[in-house]
Amino acid sequence: GETGIVKETLNPNGLVLVHGELWEADCEGEIAVGDHVTVEAVEGLKVKVKKIP
């Protein structure tokens, strides 16, 4: 999937920047601002993301 960067802490919802666009995102657990994520799915206007280790 595409990659992005967290702009608002995901706990489990927040904002990520993907290709210059802000998206509402969901994840399992918590991901901090500045962490890189990969997009696993697009659900309407939200994306499901996973932290890149």
What is each of the regions a protein language model found here?
Residues G1-P53:
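Terminal membrane-proximal soluble interaction domains of membrane-associated proteins
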